[in-house]
Amino acid sequence: MKSIVLLRHGESIWNKENRFTGWTDVDLTEKGVAEAYRAGNLLKEKGYVFNKAYTSYLKRAVKTLNCVLDRMDQDWIPVEKSWRLNEKHYGSLQGLNKSETAQKYGDEQVLIWRRSYDIAPLPLSEDDPRNPRFDIRYKDVPDKELPRTESLKDTVERILPYWKEVIFPTLRTADQILVAAHGNSLRGIIKYLKNISDEEIVHLNLPTAVPYVFEFDDDLKLVNDYFLGDPEEIKKLMEAVANQGKKK
C-alpha cells in the first residue's frame, strides 16, 4: 500500500483575521505553528516515514511542512517547492475581510467568489504592486502564466499538470509522500482524485493542519481516503471553515 498525505497549512495571520489571502505571503499564527506540530505528532504516532515532500512558494505552507518534519525527525527528506501549489489567487479581494465583504455584497456572492468552480473575483490591475510579476520569487515564471485572479477551475488547471507529471509519478518509487499546500490548491487535487463534480466541490471544506490520507494499491489505483484525527472534532473544524465567508 502506498499513500499520499495532503495537508493544508496551519492557521495563518489572515486566517485569524478572516481575510482573503490568496498569494499574499502571510505567516502562521502561534496557533498555526501548534497545529502543524500537532499534525507532525499524529503522523509520527501513525508510523509515517515520508520519502519526499512537496510544498508551495508561500511561507505558511513551507513553515507548516518544516514544523511537521521537525516533529517527525524527518527534516532530512528531499523537499520540492513549486509555485503551482500556491493557493488560488483571489485577485482584488486579497486583503479584504470576508465577513465585511459579505455584508457589502451578500453571503451568496462571497460564496461564489470563494468556492464556485469557474467564476473568478475581479483581477488585480497590471500595475498593482500585488501582481505576482513584481515578486522576485516568480522571476523564472513567464508573465503570461502568472495569475492576477483565479477561479477554482483556473487553479485546478495550474495544479494538475504538476500533480500528474511530478508528484504522482513519485509513487512509483516511493511509498509515502507528503504535500503541504493550501485549501483551494488541495481541493483541486482532491476533486481530480475523487472525481468530484463542479457543483459538489463548492461544499468541500478543508480544516487547517489536519492530515488527509489517500491510499493507493501497487497499481496506483486509489483504494481509500480518510482524515487522521477525531471525526467529531474534524467535523466542527470543517463547519468553522464553511462559516468564514458569512455575515456576522
From Swiss-Prot:
The keyword Isomerase applies. Substrate binds at residues 8-15, 21-22, 60, 87-90, 98, 114-115, 183-184. Pathway: Carbohydrate degradation; glycolysis; pyruvate from D-glyceraldehyde 3-phosphate: step 3/5. GO terms for biological process: gluconeogenesis; glycolytic process. It comes from the Bacteria. Gene3D superfamilies: Phosphoglycerate mutase-like. The record marks 182 as: Transition state stabilizer. This is 2,3-bisphosphoglycerate-dependent phosphoglycerate mutase. It comes from Parabacteroides distasonis (strain ATCC 8503 / DSM 20701 / CIP 104284 / JCM 5825 / NCTC 11152). The gene is gpmA.
